[in-house]
C-alpha cells in the first residue's frame, strides 16, 4: 500500500502492531506511526509524557491490588475516577463517589483478577458530564466541540448517547491540543479537555478518534481533511 491509517487505537493487538512495524520498515507511510500509537494506547504512559513536559492534566496515580484506600484519600481524595490501563469511548472508566464506594469497586474487580493494576485520577468537579473534544490533523486544529452527558453520567462521550455543540477555540485550548499531539507524535489525534476555574486539563488523547459526532454537530468534514493531509504527505 502507499499509506496506512490505523483505526484500531487502544485495541491494537500484538499481531497488528507487528504488521504495522513491518510495513513501516518497508517505507509505507503511516498516519499515525506505531510509536505514536504506543504512546497513547497506555493511558498512564500518555500522562507520564505530558507530565514530563509540564502539560496540565488531572493528578494521576497507578496502583496495584491490594490498594490502601487511606493513601488514595490523602493523595488524590474522593470522588475519584477509576480507569483501566487502556480503552476508548468511556469504557472501563468509573466514578467512585467516596471511600466506601471505591472499596466496593475494588472488591468487585478482585473477583476477576486479584492482581489487577488500575489508574486513579483526580475528579474535576466543574467538568462533571462535560468535556471538550478537539480534533488535530497534521499539526492543525480542524474542529472542536463541547460534549455533554444527557443522562447525568459523569462521562460525556457522544458514543454513549451524549450531546454536543461547536465551541470556539481559545488560545490555551489550541495550545494544549497541538502541544499534546506533537509530544505524542500523532498526525491525527483526538484531545479531550476537562476544565475548571484553574483552566483546562488534558483528560485523554486518542490516536484513532471517532469523528461522526464532530461531523454531525459542527458540520466540519473531518474525513475530507484527513484525505487532503494524506495527499499532501504523499506528494
Predicted feature residues:
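Structural detector of well-ordered beta-strand residues that form the stable sheet scaffold
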Residues: 30-31, 58, 81, 119-121, ...
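Rossmann-like NAD(P)H-binding beta-loop-alpha module
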Residues: 56-77
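ATP-grasp fold ATP-binding core
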Residues: 50-51, 73-91, 114-127
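Phosphate-binding site of ATP-dependent enzymes
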Residues: 91-184
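Protein kinase-like catalytic core scaffold
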Residues: 80, 142-143, 189, 201-203
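Short glycine-rich anion-binding loops that position phosphate/pyrophosphate groups of nucleotides
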Residues: 9-11, 86-87, 208
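Conserved N-proximal alpha/beta basic substrate-recognition cap immediately N-terminal to
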Residues: 1-59
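C-terminal active-site "lid" helix and adjoining low-complexity regulatory extension at the edge
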Residues: 168, 172, 182, 195-235
Amino acid at each position: 500500500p502507499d499509506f496506512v491509517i490505523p483505526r484500531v487505537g487502544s485495541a491494537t493487538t500484538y499481531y497488528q502492531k507487528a504488521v504495522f512495524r513491518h510495513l513501516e520498515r518497508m517505507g509505507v507511510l503511516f498516519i499515525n506511526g506505531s510509536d505514536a500509537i504506543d504512546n497513547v494506547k497506555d493511558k498512564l504512559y500518555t500522562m507520564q509524557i505530558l507530565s514530563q513536559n509540564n502539560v496540565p492534566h488531572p493528578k494521576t496515580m497507578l496502583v496495584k491490588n491490594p490498594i490502601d484506600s487511606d493513601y488514595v484519600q490523602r493523595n488524590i481524595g474522593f470522588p475519584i475516577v477509576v480507569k483501566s490501563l487502556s480503552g476508548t469511548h468511556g469504557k472501563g472508566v468509573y466514578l467512585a463517589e467516596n471511600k466506601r464506594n471505591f472499596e466496593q469497586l475494588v472488591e468487585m474487580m478482585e473477583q476477576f483478577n486479584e492482581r489487577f493494576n488500575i489508574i486513579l485520577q483526580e475528579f474535576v468537579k466543574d467538568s462533571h458530564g462535560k468535556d471538550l473534544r478537539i480534533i488535530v490533523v497534521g499539526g492543525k486544529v480542524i474542529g472542536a466541540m463541547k460534549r455533554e452527558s444527557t443522562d447525568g453520567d459523569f462521562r460525556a462521550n457522544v458514543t454513549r448517547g451524549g450531546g454536543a455543540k461547536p465551541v470556539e477555540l481559545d488560545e490555551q485550548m489550541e495550545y494544549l491540543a497541538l502541544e499534546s499531539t506533537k509530544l505524542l507524535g500523532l498526525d491525527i489525534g483526538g484531545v479531550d479537555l476537562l476544565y475548571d476555574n484553574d483552566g483546562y486539563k488534558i483528560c485523554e488523547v486518542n490516536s484513532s478518534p471517532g469523528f461522526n459526532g464532530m461531523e454531525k454537530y459542527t458540520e466540519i468534514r473531518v474525513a475530507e481533511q484527513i484525505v487532503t493531509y494524506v495527499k499532501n504527505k504523499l506528494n
